[in-house]
Protein backbone atom coordinates (compact mmCIF):
# COMPACT_ATOMS: atom_id res chain seq x y z
CA UNK A 1 0.00 0.00 0.00
CA UNK A 2 1.37 3.40 -0.97
CA UNK A 3 1.77 5.70 2.04
CA UNK A 4 0.90 9.39 2.07
CA UNK A 5 -1.82 11.96 2.55
CA UNK A 6 -5.39 11.85 1.20
CA UNK A 7 -4.40 13.27 -2.19
CA UNK A 8 -1.78 10.57 -2.68
CA UNK A 9 -4.31 7.92 -1.69
CA UNK A 10 -6.98 9.29 -4.04
CA UNK A 11 -4.57 9.53 -6.97
CA UNK A 12 -3.21 6.04 -6.42
CA UNK A 13 -6.73 4.59 -6.31
CA UNK A 14 -7.76 6.46 -9.48
CA UNK A 15 -4.65 5.31 -11.36
CA UNK A 16 -5.67 1.73 -10.66
CA UNK A 17 -9.22 2.13 -11.95
CA UNK A 18 -10.28 0.84 -15.34
CA UNK A 19 -13.43 2.92 -15.82
CA UNK A 20 -13.76 6.40 -17.29
CA UNK A 21 -16.02 7.88 -14.58
CA UNK A 22 -14.72 8.23 -11.02
CA UNK A 23 -17.20 8.70 -8.17
CA UNK A 24 -15.74 10.06 -4.95
CA UNK A 25 -16.82 10.54 -1.33
CA UNK A 26 -15.09 10.93 2.04
CA UNK A 27 -14.62 8.57 4.95
CA UNK A 28 -17.27 9.24 7.58
CA UNK A 29 -19.94 10.14 5.03
CA UNK A 30 -23.08 8.09 4.45
CA UNK A 31 -24.27 7.84 0.86
CA UNK A 32 -27.92 8.24 -0.01
CA UNK A 33 -29.32 5.06 -1.54
CA UNK A 34 -29.68 6.81 -4.92
CA UNK A 35 -26.37 8.67 -4.75
CA UNK A 36 -24.41 6.69 -7.32
CA UNK A 37 -27.28 6.84 -9.82
CA UNK A 38 -27.70 10.60 -9.38
CA UNK A 39 -23.98 11.41 -9.47
CA UNK A 40 -23.29 9.55 -12.74
CA UNK A 41 -26.49 10.35 -14.64
CA UNK A 42 -25.30 13.77 -15.93
CA UNK A 43 -22.43 12.03 -17.75
CA UNK A 44 -24.96 10.86 -20.33
CA UNK A 45 -24.12 14.24 -21.87
CA UNK A 46 -20.70 13.79 -23.46
CA UNK A 47 -19.55 17.35 -22.75
CA UNK A 48 -19.92 17.00 -18.96
CA UNK A 49 -16.53 16.65 -17.24
CA UNK A 50 -17.43 16.92 -13.56
CA UNK A 51 -20.53 16.45 -11.40
CA UNK A 52 -20.77 18.24 -8.07
CA UNK A 53 -23.10 16.40 -5.71
CA UNK A 54 -24.72 17.87 -2.64
CA UNK A 55 -24.39 17.06 1.07
CA UNK A 56 -26.35 17.39 4.28
CA UNK A 57 -25.33 17.27 7.92
CA UNK A 58 -26.25 14.25 10.02
CA UNK A 59 -26.53 15.77 13.50
CA UNK A 60 -26.97 13.77 16.70
CA UNK A 61 -26.72 16.72 19.10
CA UNK A 62 -27.51 20.42 19.34
CA UNK A 63 -23.79 21.17 19.09
CA UNK A 64 -23.57 19.32 15.76
CA UNK A 65 -26.74 20.99 14.54
CA UNK A 66 -25.20 24.40 15.29
CA UNK A 67 -21.92 23.44 13.63
CA UNK A 68 -23.45 22.37 10.31
CA UNK A 69 -24.20 25.89 8.91
CA UNK A 70 -20.62 26.93 9.72
CA UNK A 71 -19.26 24.17 7.48
CA UNK A 72 -21.78 23.27 4.77
CA UNK A 73 -23.55 25.35 2.14
CA UNK A 74 -27.15 25.46 3.35
CA UNK A 75 -29.99 24.95 0.82
CA UNK A 76 -31.21 28.57 0.97
CA UNK A 77 -27.69 29.85 0.22
CA UNK A 78 -27.03 27.47 -2.63
CA UNK A 79 -26.04 28.87 -6.02
CA UNK A 80 -26.10 25.95 -8.45
CA UNK A 81 -24.18 27.87 -11.14
CA UNK A 82 -21.19 28.56 -8.89
CA UNK A 83 -21.29 25.45 -6.71
CA UNK A 84 -17.86 23.79 -6.73
CA UNK A 85 -17.45 20.04 -6.23
CA UNK A 86 -16.14 18.77 -2.90
CA UNK A 87 -14.70 15.34 -2.25
CA UNK A 88 -17.67 14.52 0.00
CA UNK A 89 -19.82 14.16 -3.10
CA UNK A 90 -18.35 14.40 -6.57
CA UNK A 91 -17.68 12.49 -9.79
CA UNK A 92 -15.45 13.25 -12.76
CA UNK A 93 -14.05 11.75 -15.92
CA UNK A 94 -10.64 10.20 -15.53
CA UNK A 95 -9.48 12.20 -18.54
CA UNK A 96 -10.18 15.54 -16.82
CA UNK A 97 -8.44 14.29 -13.66
CA UNK A 98 -5.35 13.59 -15.78
CA UNK A 99 -5.61 16.97 -17.50
CA UNK A 100 -5.30 18.93 -14.23
CA UNK A 101 -2.63 16.61 -12.84
CA UNK A 102 -4.82 14.81 -10.34
CA UNK A 103 -5.34 15.86 -6.75
CA UNK A 104 -2.47 18.11 -5.56
CA UNK A 105 -0.31 15.85 -3.40
CA UNK A 106 1.60 18.73 -1.82
CA UNK A 107 -1.50 19.75 0.15
CA UNK A 108 -2.81 17.69 3.05
CA UNK A 109 -5.74 19.77 4.30
CA UNK A 110 -7.79 21.06 1.36
CA UNK A 111 -6.70 19.11 -1.69
CA UNK A 112 -10.25 18.81 -3.00
CA UNK A 113 -10.78 22.59 -3.00
CA UNK A 114 -7.51 23.15 -4.87
CA UNK A 115 -8.53 20.38 -7.29
CA UNK A 116 -11.90 22.09 -7.83
CA UNK A 117 -10.20 25.43 -8.47
CA UNK A 118 -7.98 23.79 -11.10
CA UNK A 119 -11.05 22.35 -12.81
CA UNK A 120 -12.66 25.78 -12.78
CA UNK A 121 -9.52 27.46 -14.15
CA UNK A 122 -9.46 25.22 -17.25
CA UNK A 123 -13.20 25.80 -17.73
CA UNK A 124 -14.15 22.17 -17.21
CA UNK A 125 -17.87 21.55 -17.70
CA UNK A 126 -19.17 21.20 -14.12
CA UNK A 127 -22.78 20.19 -13.47
CA UNK A 128 -24.53 20.38 -10.10
CA UNK A 129 -26.61 17.35 -9.09
CA UNK A 130 -28.77 18.44 -6.14
CA UNK A 131 -30.15 14.94 -5.56
CA UNK A 132 -26.75 13.24 -5.38
CA UNK A 133 -26.68 13.56 -1.61
CA UNK A 134 -24.24 12.32 1.00
CA UNK A 135 -24.73 12.75 4.73
CA UNK A 136 -21.80 14.25 6.61
CA UNK A 137 -21.14 13.57 10.29
CA UNK A 138 -20.14 16.85 12.03
CA UNK A 139 -17.41 17.07 14.67
CA UNK A 140 -18.59 16.23 18.17
CA UNK A 141 -17.06 18.95 20.35
CA UNK A 142 -15.34 22.34 20.34
CA UNK A 143 -11.82 20.88 20.22
CA UNK A 144 -12.59 18.83 17.11
CA UNK A 145 -14.37 21.81 15.52
CA UNK A 146 -11.40 24.11 16.24
CA UNK A 147 -8.96 21.65 14.65
CA UNK A 148 -11.19 21.34 11.57
CA UNK A 149 -11.44 25.12 11.03
CA UNK A 150 -7.72 25.52 11.77
CA UNK A 151 -6.82 22.92 9.13
CA UNK A 152 -9.14 24.55 6.58
CA UNK A 153 -7.45 27.92 7.09
CA UNK A 154 -3.93 26.48 7.15
CA UNK A 155 -4.57 24.52 3.95
CA UNK A 156 -6.01 27.53 2.14
CA UNK A 157 -3.04 29.71 3.06
CA UNK A 158 -0.52 27.04 2.05
CA UNK A 159 -2.26 26.92 -1.33
CA UNK A 160 -2.30 30.76 -1.61
CA UNK A 161 -6.10 30.76 -1.39
CA UNK A 162 -7.45 33.72 0.56
CA UNK A 163 -11.21 33.52 0.92
CA UNK A 164 -13.21 36.69 1.48
CA UNK A 165 -14.58 35.36 4.78
CA UNK A 166 -11.06 34.81 6.14
CA UNK A 167 -9.94 38.28 5.03
CA UNK A 168 -12.98 39.87 6.71
CA UNK A 169 -12.34 37.96 9.95
CA UNK A 170 -8.69 39.06 10.02
CA UNK A 171 -9.69 42.66 9.31
CA UNK A 172 -12.44 42.59 11.94
CA UNK A 173 -10.17 41.36 14.72
CA UNK A 174 -7.25 43.59 13.69
CA UNK A 175 -9.49 46.66 14.06
CA UNK A 176 -10.76 45.32 17.38
CA UNK A 177 -7.27 44.73 18.76
CA UNK A 178 -6.06 48.17 17.65
CA UNK A 179 -9.10 49.77 19.26
CA UNK A 180 -8.48 47.83 22.48
CA UNK A 181 -4.84 48.95 22.56
CA UNK A 182 -5.93 52.57 22.08
CA UNK A 183 -8.34 52.20 24.98
CA UNK A 184 -5.63 50.76 27.27
CA UNK A 185 -3.02 53.36 26.30
CA UNK A 186 -5.14 56.50 26.18
CA UNK A 187 -8.14 55.59 28.33
CA UNK A 188 -10.64 56.22 25.58
CA UNK A 189 -13.63 55.03 27.59
CA UNK A 190 -15.93 55.77 24.69
CA UNK A 191 -13.98 53.17 22.69
CA UNK A 192 -14.62 50.61 25.44
CA UNK A 193 -18.39 51.08 25.14
CA UNK A 194 -18.20 50.97 21.35
CA UNK A 195 -16.21 47.71 21.42
CA UNK A 196 -18.60 46.19 23.95
CA UNK A 197 -21.59 47.11 21.83
CA UNK A 198 -19.98 45.74 18.66
CA UNK A 199 -19.14 42.48 20.43
CA UNK A 200 -22.74 42.03 21.59
CA UNK A 201 -24.03 42.80 18.10
CA UNK A 202 -21.56 40.30 16.66
CA UNK A 203 -22.86 37.60 18.99
CA UNK A 204 -26.44 38.49 18.09
CA UNK A 205 -25.57 38.36 14.39
CA UNK A 206 -24.18 34.82 14.77
CA UNK A 207 -27.54 33.74 16.19
CA UNK A 208 -29.61 35.73 13.70
CA UNK A 209 -27.93 34.23 10.61
CA UNK A 210 -28.02 30.59 11.72
CA UNK A 211 -30.82 30.09 14.26
CA UNK A 212 -33.27 29.13 11.49
CA UNK A 213 -31.24 25.94 10.94
CA UNK A 214 -31.26 24.93 14.61
CA UNK A 215 -34.46 26.26 16.21
CA UNK A 216 -33.45 25.38 19.75
CA UNK A 217 -32.94 27.75 22.68
CA UNK A 218 -29.47 26.27 23.33
CA UNK A 219 -28.38 27.79 20.03
CA UNK A 220 -28.40 31.23 21.68
CA UNK A 221 -25.29 30.11 23.56
CA UNK A 222 -23.79 27.63 21.12
CA UNK A 223 -23.87 29.70 17.92
CA UNK A 224 -21.90 32.70 19.32
CA UNK A 225 -19.43 30.28 20.91
CA UNK A 226 -18.89 28.50 17.59
CA UNK A 227 -18.53 31.84 15.82
CA UNK A 228 -15.72 32.86 18.17
CA UNK A 229 -14.02 29.44 18.07
CA UNK A 230 -14.12 29.34 14.26
CA UNK A 231 -12.80 32.92 14.08
CA UNK A 232 -9.86 32.13 16.37
CA UNK A 233 -9.12 28.92 14.48
CA UNK A 234 -9.14 30.74 11.13
CA UNK A 235 -6.89 33.52 12.46
CA UNK A 236 -4.35 31.09 13.94
CA UNK A 237 -4.46 28.75 10.93
CA UNK A 238 -4.01 31.62 8.47
CA UNK A 239 -1.21 33.15 10.55
CA UNK A 240 0.67 29.85 10.80
CA UNK A 241 0.19 29.30 7.07
CA UNK A 242 1.65 32.71 6.28
CA UNK A 243 4.61 32.10 8.60
CA UNK A 244 5.30 28.72 6.99
CA UNK A 245 4.95 30.16 3.50
CA UNK A 246 6.80 33.45 3.86
CA UNK A 247 8.55 33.32 7.23
Question: Where are the predicted features?
Answer:
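Short, acidic/glycine-rich phosphate-metal binding loop used to engage nucleotide
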Residues: 1-6, 56, 81, 105-106, ...
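Glycine-rich, basic loop-to-helix element that forms the pyrophosphate-binding segment
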Residues: 1-17, 38, 87
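Short aromatic/hydrophobic "clamp" motif used to bind/position activated sugar donors
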Residues: 22
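Active-site acidic Asp-centered loop
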Residues: 25-27, 104
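Conserved donor NDP-sugar-binding/catalytic core segment of glycosyltransferases
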Residues: 30-64
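A recurrent flexible, glycine/aromatic-enriched loop bordering the glycosyltransferase active site
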Residues: 57-59, 73-95, 108, 114, ...
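Catalytic donor/gating beta->alpha subdomain of glycosyltransferases that bind UDP-sugars
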Residues: 104-164
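Membrane-embedded multi-pass helical conduit in multi-pass membrane proteins
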Residues: 172-246
Amino acid sequence: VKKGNRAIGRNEAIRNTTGDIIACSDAGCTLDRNWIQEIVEPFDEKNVNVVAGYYKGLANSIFQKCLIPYVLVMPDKLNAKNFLPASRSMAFRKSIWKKVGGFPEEFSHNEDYVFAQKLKSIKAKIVFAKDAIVYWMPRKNLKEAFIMFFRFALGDTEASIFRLKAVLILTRYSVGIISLVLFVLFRYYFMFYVLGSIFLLYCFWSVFKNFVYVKNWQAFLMLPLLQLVSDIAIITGTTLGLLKKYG
